[in-house]
């Protein structure tokens, strides 16, 4: 989780809830005004389970909103193993900390005013997902979808991929 972020957005959002797949480095994230158990449960169901199926395991920090009754019941329902990262040692969960840092940096470079950062979050995620990760030697997009992403710039300027298929 990233936040609280100041200033809060036009719609009152102050937090970014982040999930990362350890193998592909794929990141899912959403912005929220508050991060309660109900918000975390909805995020896991809507943004993770409904898109990719239930994960085998999730690792969260030790905050109550990630470890309460609703989350325990969710994990039991979907047969998800739930464990916690080491308390007071964020470096032990390095992949998440690195992803959080990178997402924050990308958002900071994209925002026009700091109150619109929530509108830049999808674009920031796209930039993160289509950048090569040194740990895998590939982009998260390629590892998840098995193909290269079509970049927004390629819509305006035809890429070599397009030219090869025409010739």
Where are these regions (language model features)?
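Integrase module of LTR retroelements
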Residues: 1-167
């Amino acid at each position: 989780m990233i936040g609280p972020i100041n200033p809060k957005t036009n719609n009152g959002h102050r937090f970014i809830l982040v999930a990362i797949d350890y193998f592909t480095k794929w990141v899912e994230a959403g912005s929220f005004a508050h991060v309660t158990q109900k918000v975390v449960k909805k995020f896991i169901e809507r943004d993770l389970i409904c898109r990719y199926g239930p994960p085998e395991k999730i690792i969260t920090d030790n905050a109550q909103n990630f470890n309460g009754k609703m989350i325990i019941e969710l994990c039991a329902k979907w047969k998800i193993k739930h464990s916690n990262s080491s308390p007071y040692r964020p470096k032990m969960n390095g992949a998440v900390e690195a992803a959080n840092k990178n997402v924050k940096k990308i958002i900071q470079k994209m925002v026009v005013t700091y109150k619109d950062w929530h509108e830049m979050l999808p674009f920031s995620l796209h930039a993160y997902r289509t950048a090569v990760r040194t740990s895998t030697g590939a982009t998260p997009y390629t590892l998840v979808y098995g193909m290269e992403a079509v970049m927004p710039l390629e819509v305006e300027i035809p890429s070599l991929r397009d030219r090869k298929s025409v010739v």
